[in-house]
């Protein structure tokens, strides 16, 4: 059926027999301008952005047509900080309302890139001369894990890092460590020194009695085969503890 000339959206101009069709103006969604402004603020002063704003921007790729601010705030409310959001298990991230598998996968990808970047700053370097970088890497890799991990940094005779391996993963407050296996692996890699690292999911890096006893056993087992244990570092959300710094090695 032909559209009436008197219907809304049609305009008749004097001297013209045809009717002009006007296309209604479509407003951009409110979040479109917000995203542009947030990106510009990031370019100008990235350090001035709040944690939830940085997380908003991380979510842009996974959520292309919606406001990401509510989800960013919900994730921080659920897990506590950006670091804890990224370290959270993928399944738990996906369970946050508005997240789902795509968001969870995207955030775990960001975490993997961050860990790889931190690791690249210590590989093939003289580790003892780059100690702050080592601590930064271990903190990024382990401090926010929900279960204890026991990691070993294997060094050559020049104290360069030749391998970085997670030896064991345990429970929330315990990781089984077998000195014989640690020493065996060091010999396989021709390592002449090692640095022991594990995390405390509680956040408190204070060594336990069990940590101290296990370290003594490991030091003795390594010493028998001329392998030096430079340090045992415990990392947590609230800092780190060095056995050598505490006089425990």
UniProtKB/Swiss-Prot annotation:
Amino acids binding Zn(2+): 198, 200, 211
Pfam family, one: RadC
Sorted UniProt keywords: Hydrolase, Metal-binding, Metalloprotease, Protease, Zinc
Organism: Brucella anthropi (strain ATCC 49188 / DSM 6882 / CCUG 24695 / JCM 21032 / LMG 3331 / NBRC 15819 / NCTC 12168 / Alc 37)
UniProt cross-references to InterPro entries, sorted A to Z: MPN, RadC_JAB, RuvA_2-like, UPF0758, UPF0758_CS
Protein name according to UniProt: UPF0758 protein Oant_1909
Family statement drawn from the similarity comment of this UniProt entry: Belongs to the UPF0758 family.
Annotated MPN domain residues: 127-249
GO biological process: proteolysis
SUPFAM superfamilies attached to this UniProt entry: JAB1/MPN domain, RuvA domain 2-like
């Amino acid at each position: 059926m032909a559209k009436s000339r008197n219907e809304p959206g049609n305009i008749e101009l004097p001297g013209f027999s045809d009717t002009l069709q006007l296309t209604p103006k479509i407003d951009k969604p409110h979040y479109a301008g917000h995203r542009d402004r947030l990106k510009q603020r990031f370019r100008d002063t990235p350090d001035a952005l709040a944690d939830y704003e940085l997380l908003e921007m991380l979510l842009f790729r996974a959520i292309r047509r919606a406001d990401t601010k509510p989800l960013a705030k919900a994730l921080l409310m659920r897990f506590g900080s950006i670091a804890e959001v990224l370290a959270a298990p993928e399944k738990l991230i996906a369970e946050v309302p508005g997240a789902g598998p795509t968001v969870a996968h995207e955030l775990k990808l960001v975490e993997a890139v961050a860990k790889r970047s931190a690791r690249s700053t210590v590989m093939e370097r003289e580790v003892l001369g780059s100690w702050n970088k080592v601590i930064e890497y271990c903190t990024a890799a382990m401090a926010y894990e929900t279960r204890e991990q026991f990691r070993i940094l294997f060094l050559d005779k020049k104290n360069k890092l030749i391998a970085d391996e997670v030896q064991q993963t345990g429970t929330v407050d315990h990781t089984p460590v077998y000195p014989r296996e640690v020493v065996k692996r060091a010999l396989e890699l021709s390592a002449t020194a090692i640095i022991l690292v594990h995390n405390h999911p509680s956040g408190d890096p204070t060594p336990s009695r069990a940590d101290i006893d296990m370290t003594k056993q490991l030091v003795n087992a390594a010493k028998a085969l001329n392998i030096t244990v430079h340090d045992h570092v415990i990392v947590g959300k609230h800092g780190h503890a060095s056995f050598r710094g505490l006089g425990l090695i």
